[in-house]
């Protein structure tokens, strides 16, 4: 993917756009960075010559353009409010800005475009959408102090992200609803501390990369492919099982560490109701991860094995297994490191 010169150019511009947004000291500058990011990400989405990727890029453009328009309008209103002695309600304007940023990040209740769009993307584009494209909106959300709307979005995101993945047969939609659920956890960490949000985002990005990397190299897009996937290779199926559990946040895997930090901070802030909802939603996500892995282990369609033939000694497979090792034993290694300090 990244060996194409045009893709390198657009990826670089996309990164620059995000950095402009993050380092900007005005809403107008942040809007400009978001637009640069948007206009460079669309060519990356629509590069493949198939109908679904073109449709996905159009959906992304329309939703992001709507959010950008609302953000620009609200930014102008804020500038007018500062010049007109606060005759315009600043809290209402900030709420509109928050809604636009939640739409950009794909958080509930503005999530409806996200799973459908994910279905038309390649795995590497889906990974960028789930990780890098969330940095700028979440950083801008951290500048706003509107707890009530953020709390509603957190509750809806964790519930919809958990329940929405229950009846999915597409792995891309499954990862999309998982991303919405994790986004709820990230938004809740934004209410507490920016450093905890960054830690959560880094760990989530790594775990998402491990899974999408595997799905990409083995060309897996639907659940029924997992049933016929390497019947004779129990190691790869076991690694898939462990990575799903780590992404779900089950101890003692690496994915539990960021959730542990969020749980600890929410407990200190006496947010017991929110914490209970978030933990219940995590149990639901772990349930459908376990159901997928149980089916992949127990249901084998031997007549379809020829579809998934690949070189088991490839460098990609070895890299995936190395990353899986850190996904499984990362929490132990980090604990050992701090213990030795």
UniProtKB/Swiss-Prot annotation:
GO cellular component: mitochondrial inner membrane; respiratory chain complex I
Bilayer topology: Multi-pass membrane protein
Localization, UniProt: Mitochondrion inner membrane
Source superkingdom: Eukaryota
Enzyme class: translocase
An MF annotation (GO) of this entry: NADH dehydrogenase (ubiquinone) activity
GO biological process, one term: mitochondrial electron transport, NADH to ubiquinone
Membership in a protein family: Belongs to the complex I subunit 2 family.
Official protein name in the record: NADH-ubiquinone oxidoreductase chain 2
Organism from which the protein derives: Drosophila yakuba (Fruit fly)
């Amino acid at each position: 993917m990244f060996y194409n010169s045009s893709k390198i150019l657009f990826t670089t511009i996309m990164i620059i756009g995000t950095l402009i947004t993050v380092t900007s000291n005005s809403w107008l500058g942040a809007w400009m960075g978001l637009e640069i990011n948007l206009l460079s990400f669309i060519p990356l989405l629509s590069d493949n010559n198939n109908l679904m990727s073109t449709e996905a890029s159009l959906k992304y453009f329309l939703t992001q353009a709507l959010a950008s328009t609302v953000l620009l309008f609200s930014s102008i209103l804020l500038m007018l409010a500062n010049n007109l002695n606060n005759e315009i309600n600043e809290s209402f304007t900030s709420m509109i800005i928050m809604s636009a940023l939640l739409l950009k990040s794909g958080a509930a209740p503005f999530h409806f475009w996200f799973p459908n769009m994910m279905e038309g993307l390649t795995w590497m584009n889906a990974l960028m959408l789930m990780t890098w494209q969330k940095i700028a909106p979440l950083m801008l959300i951290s500048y706003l102090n509107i707890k009530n709307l953020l709390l509603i979005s957190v509750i809806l995101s964790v519930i919809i992200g958990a329940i929405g993945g229950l009846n999915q047969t597409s792995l891309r939609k499954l990862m999309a609803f998982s991303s919405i659920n994790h986004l709820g956890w990230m938004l809740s960490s934004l209410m507490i501390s920016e450093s905890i949000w960054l830690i959560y985002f880094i760990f989530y990005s790594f775990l998402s990369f491990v899974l999408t990397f595997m799905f990409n190299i083995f060309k897996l897009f639907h659940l029924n492919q997992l049933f016929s996937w390497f019947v004779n290779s129990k190691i790869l199926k076991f690694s898939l099982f462990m990575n799903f559990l780590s992404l779900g946040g089950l101890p003692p895997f690496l994915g539990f560490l960021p959730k542990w930090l969020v749980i600890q901070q929410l407990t200190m802030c006496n947010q017991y109701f929110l914490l209970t909802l978030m933990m219940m939603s995590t149990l639901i996500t772990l349930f459908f991860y376990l159901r997928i892995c149980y089916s992949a282990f127990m249901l084998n369609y031997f007549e379809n094995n020829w579809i998934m033939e690949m070189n088991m000694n490839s460098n990609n497979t070895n890299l995936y297994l190395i990353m899986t090792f850190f996904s499984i034993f990362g929490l132990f290694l980090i604990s050992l490191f701090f213990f030795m300090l």
